[in-house]
Every structure is written in C-alpha cells, then in structure tokens.
C-alpha cells in the first residue's frame, strides 16, 4: 500500500480540468476515487454498486459513465461537451469536492466502521 501521496500525482490532479477515474472494482471505490474528487476537477467515474451513505449524484458531484462499448462512445461525447463548458465543469467539480470533504473523509469511514461494530455487538 501507499504510505503517502506523491507530490507529482497531487499536482497533476489539482492542475486537471477533468479526471477520468475507473474504480478497481464495482463497490465503493478506493482512495483514488476520493482523491480525484477532492481535487476540485470534474471527475468522470463508473458508478459504484454498494450503497453508501451520501452517495455521489450524477451531474451534481461527478459525471457517471458505463464501461459498455456504447458507454465509451457517450463518454467521449461527454468529455468533449464539458471541455468547452467551463462554468458547468467547474461547478460540478466544486460540488464534488465539497461533498467529499463533508461526507467521505477518512474520519467518516472510521465512524461507519465503529457504528457497524456497535450495531453488531448490540445484537450479540
């Protein structure tokens, strides 16, 4: 695992207008999901299957795409659309960043784990 974030990677994220992110599996994403969203860039992301508290909303916090052949054609069109619409792109990127900072930081994950353990222990 990583012990930190390479400054070059961080600079690349924060300098980007658009970040194309693919989840490593269909569940709740990984650290890069939240890193990309916290950059403030517009993030294109394949949807996650696992229901999470405070889910991302397509078109509000990020732009979703699917991995089908037709989905890839639509993805290209969406990227071109947002490249030329600074205000929309920046608004979604800003809202995504705000959403992640409010609901998806490490402390939120820790609290979810504690809540799940407490609930499991209450049922024992």
Please place each PLM-identified region on the residue numbering.
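Catalytic binding pocket for nucleotide-activated donors in carbohydrate/polymer assembly enzymes
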Residues: 3, 7-124
């Amino acid at each position: 695992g990583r012990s930190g974030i390479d400054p070059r990677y961080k600079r690349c994220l924060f300098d980007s207008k658009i970040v194309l992110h693919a989840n490593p599996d269909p569940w709740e994403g990984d650290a890069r999901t939240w890193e990309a969203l916290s950059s403030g860039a517009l993030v294109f992301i394949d949807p996650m299957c696992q229901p999470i508290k405070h889910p991302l909303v397509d078109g509000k916090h990020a732009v979703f795409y699917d991995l089908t052949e037709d989905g890839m054609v639509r993805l290209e069109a969406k990227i071109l659309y947002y490249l030329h619409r600074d205000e929309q792109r920046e608004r979604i990127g800003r809202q995504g960043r705000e959403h992640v900072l409010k609901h998806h930081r490490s402390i939120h994950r820790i609290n979810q784990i504690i809540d799940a353990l407490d609930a499991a222990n209450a049922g024992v």
